[in-house]
């Protein structure tokens, strides 16, 4: 069989199509498929460039119901003017073995990361949660606010970021008028029920053990080696959840460090999203902080690329 030419979708078109996709529902469905054995999530592949010049991570996934599999490859290229990070997703047919789609996945990555956090917030946050803290003000923070704004009756949304200026604040307020700048990190965290860490930091941003009251803290990944937004030693003092228990502990920086240096075990993870959405894991009781860690799954990339492909094919 001759090789098929895949659809090639550049960033501008990907953004246009993304606006027409229910990303939150796509993420919920993939974790339900994972729980039902209709999806497969291999571990991430980290490949380091020689001489410390960067790395690339491959995110793999299989959606049996949709008869597709795929890989997103994302390099972290060290440069004098700062690191360069890109991402492209290749979607393949399980029926023909031919490529279906090659897509610039930069914005898709941001969307699926935020939507996955939102799925976790909906599953883990107390029903009465009303105070939201957003740590970060870049595109990832904007996307997080977009997907969580309707999940609870937020009475206040406090934002803290060293880069938060009036332009960024107004941009966040365009998403949710309740967003307001906090004068300090401490002010943003004060009495918060849900804390969304949306930074590109490779080192701890907050210590959940110092919160005045138990809260749900969510954390994402960046490509930096062993990146983490909370101290590794804090895991033992929290109810820990993750996107997928079979892969996250092998990639999340604080989990790796906690296991190596602080006696923490991945067996302490109370549940992942597949287990939570299929009622196979307990919810937190909030006698202490709850922590949700996502590393970004290939399944998320494949599900979103597949939704984009189907939409593109439908015209």
UniProtKB/Swiss-Prot annotation:
Q: Which reaction does it catalyse?
A: L-arginine + NAD(+) + H2O = 5-guanidino-2-oxopentanoate + NH4(+) + NADH + H(+); L-arginine + NADP(+) + H2O = 5-guanidino-2-oxopentanoate + NH4(+) + NADPH + H(+)
What Pfam family does this protein match (any one)?
A: OCD_Mu_crystall
Q: State the source organism's domain of life.
A: Bacteria
Q: Give GO cellular component annotations, separated by semicolons.
A: cytoplasm
Print the keywords alphabetically.
NAD, NADP, Oxidoreductase
What if the gene is knocked out? Cells lacking this gene grow similarly to the wild-type on D-Arg or D-Lys as sole nitrogen source, but are unable to grow on D-Arg as sole carbon source.
Q: Does the keyword Oxidoreductase apply?
A: yes
Q: Which GO terms describe its molecular function?
A: oxidoreductase activity, acting on the CH-NH2 group of donors, NAD or NADP as acceptor
Q: What is its EC number?
A: 1.4.1.25
What does the entry say induces or represses the expression of this protein? Induced by growth on D-arginine and D-lysine. Repressed by DauR. ArgR could be a transcriptional activator of the dauBAR operon in response to the presence of L-Arg.
- GO biological process annotations for this chain's record? arginine catabolic process; arginine metabolic process
Q: What SUPFAM superfamilies does this protein map onto? A: NAD(P)-binding Rossmann-fold domains
Q: Which Gene3D superfamilies does this entry report, sorted A to Z?
A: NAD(P)-binding Rossmann-like Domain, ornithine cyclodeaminase, domain 1
What's this protein's function? Involved in the anabolism of D-lysine and D-arginine. Under aerobic conditions, the arginine succinyltransferase (AST) and arginine transaminase (ATA) pathways are 2 major routes for L-arginine utilization as the sole source of carbon and nitrogen. The D-to-L racemization of arginine by DauA and DauB is necessary, before to be channeled into the AST and/or ATA pathways. DauB catalyzes the synthesis of L-arginine from 2-ketoarginine (2-KA) and ammonium.
PANTHER family to which the protein is assigned, alphabetical: KETIMINE REDUCTASE MU-CRYSTALLIN (PTHR13812:SF19)
Family per similarity comment: Belongs to the ornithine cyclodeaminase/mu-crystallin family.
What is the name attached to this protein's record? NAD(P)H-dependent anabolic L-arginine dehydrogenase DauB
State the gene name recorded for this protein. Answer: dauB
